[in-house]
Amino acid sequence: MEEWRAGMLKKYIICILFWLSLIITIPAFALFKIPDTDFGVNFSEAVTYDTKSLLMKFNYKTNDLKMGPYTGTWKNRKASSKFLMFGKRKTSTEITLVHEAYGTWFMFCSGILKEFEIYGFSFDRQNEIDYQCLMRNGEKEAVLIVLPFQKPKFSMGPPVENRQVKITLPDGREIKAVSLHKTVGHKRSHPKPVGYKIVNEGKAIGGIGRLEKKNVILIGDEIADTDDAHLAFMSGLGLWFFQHNDRKSPLD
């Protein structure tokens, strides 16, 4: 009888330890409801494109793209290397985007992050730009550039990565995007962006983030029937891959 009780107690303790370890290792977003991105503007009437189909794909594999009226293919690559204290993480994405009205556009996005690691602490080394997307259709070209965030001289914990993005359109106009770090109903700012807002002359025209429980690319209703809607969509697509790739793999 005593042996049976001891055996049951052992199994009980092992079960408790298992669930405790599981709770500790599973990210918070897997256990609790994920709040929507706080865009600071009303996007309730925006056109949305669900980005779920862009997840869970193998590296180097060419994947089919189907988002609303858009079709095409995309291929995403992530690689890292390290020598002594110096490390490097590279990402690149090739996208062929086909739309009945706007034709075929080719997008190539790439980024590189250089790191210096000592005593188990990793420090990013500043680049002139962190990420760039070239978008071409014949002689038409648009360019998206993600600038490095301003690193504080001293920070307790991870700093908030406030990102500025420059987007040059084929006609020479320049629009911008800014990173978003707050979620609806919460005051705390997340270190990594939880979305981006695309802005033209101070007015939000699109973005990426979480809206109504879905991760989406957003196009403001006021530009939905204009050529700018297509350019905002491509910019959002480039930013989605930047945000997706700007996460260190647990295998690094």
Regions found by a protein language model. Give the residues of each.
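Intrinsically disordered, glycine-rich low-complexity segments
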Residues: 1-5
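Bacterial N-terminal signal peptides that target proteins for export
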Residues: 6-16
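Bacterial N-terminal signal peptides
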Residues: 15-27
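Intrinsically disordered, low-complexity proline/glycine-rich segments
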Residues: 30-252
